[in-house]
Structures are given as structure tokens and as C-alpha cells.
Amino acid sequence: MNLHELKPNESAVKDKKRIGRGLGSGKGKTAGRGYKGQKSRSGDNRVAPYFEGGQTPLHMRVPKVGFRSPFKKEYSVINLSMLEKHFNDGDEITKETLLAKSLIKKGKPVKILGMGEVTKKFKVKVDAISSSAKQKIEAAGGSVEILEAAGE
């Protein structure tokens, strides 16, 4: 047996269905395209996935809601529980010390929130602080200084 003598079994290869070649062929007349419409025509008949046939599309029917203020201040927030965990009694807490311990990311002003308890004295110098956090720090004997923003 040689390579040129190999051939597939009798039933293994089916002839390709030739479309549009007479009514008796099973794929004659409309050639599987149905009747009329963009997809039955010749040429490029791809339709954009969001096109709904001329009906106002969904993304235009859904109402527009709200807006984003360009003046909104976004803070790097940190809770008292994290300060209690990462700093010792009498430590000064500033943006730089928080960055050094990887508790905040660079570029945003820092705000301290009041979740957690404080047992150590901290000297806190940050851009903003919640009233509950300020009360807890001062009750523990610490001090709070709010820094003024450069642009204000």
C-alpha cells in the first residue's frame, strides 16, 4: 500500500450542498436566505449588533441620570483601628508616615474616620477627620491638627 492509494471510506465524504440551483435541490429559489430584507440581498449585509431595525435603540431609550461633580474631593480614608494597629503610643501621624507604612496611596488628601477604639496618644496631622475620630483621639489624650489645602 502506498500513500497515493489511500482514500476515505465511501460514506465519509459528503458532497457540498450547492445553493440556489433549482427548486428540487432543497436549497433553491431563496437559497436559505428567506424572503426580502437586508440579509437577503447580495453584498455586505452585516448589521451592527446594536442596530434594532430603525426602532429607537435601547441605549437611547434609557434615561440619562445624574452627573459627576468636577469639584468633588476624593480622600484616602483610614480608620482609627488601623492607626491603633500600626502606630505606637506618642507617634506623630502624617501623610508621610502613612505612606511609609503603605496604609494609603499617593496623590489623594488623607481623611481619618472613627471606626475602632483608641488607647494610645497620637499627634495627628491630616487633611480631614471625622468628628467621631477627633473626639476619640482627644479623649485618649492625643492631638489633632487639620492641614490647610494649598489652593484654598
UniProtKB/Swiss-Prot annotation:
What NCBIfam families does this protein's entry cite? rplO_bact
- Report quaternary structure and partners: Part of the 50S ribosomal subunit.
Q: Where is this region: Disordered?
A: 1-55
A biological-process GO annotation: translation
Write down the Gene3D superfamilies for this protein, in alphabetical order: 3.100.10.10
Key words, A-Z: Ribonucleoprotein, Ribosomal protein, RNA-binding, rRNA-binding
Name of the protein in question: Large ribosomal subunit protein uL15
User: Its family?
Assistant: Belongs to the universal ribosomal protein uL15 family.
| Ribosomal protein keyword on record | yes
Its function, per the record, reads: Binds to the 23S rRNA.
* One term of GO molecular function: rRNA binding
InterPro entries named among the record's database cross-references:
Ribosomal_uL15 (IPR030878), Ribosomal_uL15/eL18 (IPR021131), Ribosomal_uL15/eL18_sf (IPR036227), Ribosomal_uL15_bac-type (IPR005749), Ribosomal_uL15_CS (IPR001196)
The signal peptide annotation in the UniProt record is none
| Pfam families noted in UniProt | Ribosomal_L27A
* Biased composition, class Gly residues, residue ranges: 21-35
Lineage, top-rank taxon, reads: Bacteria
**According to the UniProt entry, which residue ranges have a biased composition of type Basic and acidic residues?**
1-14
Q: Name one GO cellular component term.
A: cytosolic large ribosomal subunit
Q: Which gene encodes it?
A: rplO
What HAMAP family does this protein map onto? Ribosomal_uL15
